[in-house]
């Protein structure tokens, strides 16, 4: 089955745009997203620009705060604390990766859980696995929406997750468990990965490797 991701994304943006418009009318306030970007990695800059474009498109107030690669950890932590206290900022996103001299874990934990757009804060991770309301990492959430659009009822489906990262594989598994799927998480040490995949109704690949496993001839 081919899924038209662009069409589904456009529909979701319209739904979000309407929701934001309703929030504006109700609270007389424009929700705001602030992104902290450190360094000049081309991939990060493109990713952040796309986020800004999408945010503006749905009616969010968007701000990008840029720092050189030489910025200190203390400066980043101070800015995060400032944004935590700023009532005009609804969401905070620190673009990863960060330079090696900055402790990623420390920065993530400094973000207020209520403003943690990426869903990386330990409190949001715990809430997701416990079935409570939480922010959810965007990649697994996007995959979840795609799956639900083409198959609304997932009861009893066997889902195979390839990858066990905290950013993608694990939250993806939690989302599908909430939909009553039978979930198997596979990884680089899994024996006979192809066999596991062939038994699945749903396969989500969350690994940064091309042609990680072949399911059928000319397919991955």
What kind of region is each of these model predictions?
Residues 213-220:
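Conserved small/polar residues in nucleotide/adenosyl-binding loops
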Residues 55-67, 183:
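Short beta-strand elements in bilobed, periplasmic/extracellular small-molecule ligand-binding domains
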Residues 39, 63-73, 188-189:
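Short beta->alpha junction loops
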Residues 30-40:
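Short beta-strand segments enriched in small/hydrophobic residues
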Residues 93-154, 172, 211:
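Anion-binding alpha/beta catalytic cores of soluble intermediary-metabolism enzymes, centered on
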Residues 75-86:
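Short, well-structured alpha-helical segments in soluble
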Residues 44-50, 137-212:
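Glycine-rich phosphate/diphosphate-binding loop of Rossmann-like nucleotide-binding domains
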Residues 1-25:
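Positively charged, low-complexity intrinsically disordered leader regions
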């Amino acid at each position: 089955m081919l899924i038209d991701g662009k069409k589904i994304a456009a529909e979701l943006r319209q739904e979000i745009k309407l929701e934001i418009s309703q929030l504006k009318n109700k609270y007389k306030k424009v929700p705001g997203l602030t992104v902290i970007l450190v360094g000049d990695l081309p991939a990060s800059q493109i990713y952040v620009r796309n986020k800004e474009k999408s945010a503006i498109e749905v009616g969010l107030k968007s701000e990008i705060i840029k720092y050189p690669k030489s910025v200190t950890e203390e400066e980043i932590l101070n800015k995060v604390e400032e944004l935590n206290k700023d009532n005009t900022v609804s969401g905070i996103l620190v673009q990863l990766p960060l330079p090696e001299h900055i402790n990623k874990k420390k920065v993530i934990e400094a973000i207020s859980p209520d403003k943690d757009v990426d869903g990386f804060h330990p409190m949001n991770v715990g809430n997701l696995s416990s079935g409570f309301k939480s922010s959810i990492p965007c990649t697994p959430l996007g995959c979840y929406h795609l799956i639900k659009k083409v198959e609304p009822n997932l009861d009893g489906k066997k889902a195979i997750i390839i990858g066990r990262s905290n950013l993608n594989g694990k939250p993806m598994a939690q989302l599908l468990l909430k939909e009553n799927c039978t979930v198997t998480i596979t990884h680089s040490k899994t024996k006979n990965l192809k066999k596991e995949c062939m038994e699945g109704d749903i396969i989500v690949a969350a690994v940064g490797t091309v042609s990680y496993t072949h399911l059928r001839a000319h397919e991955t």
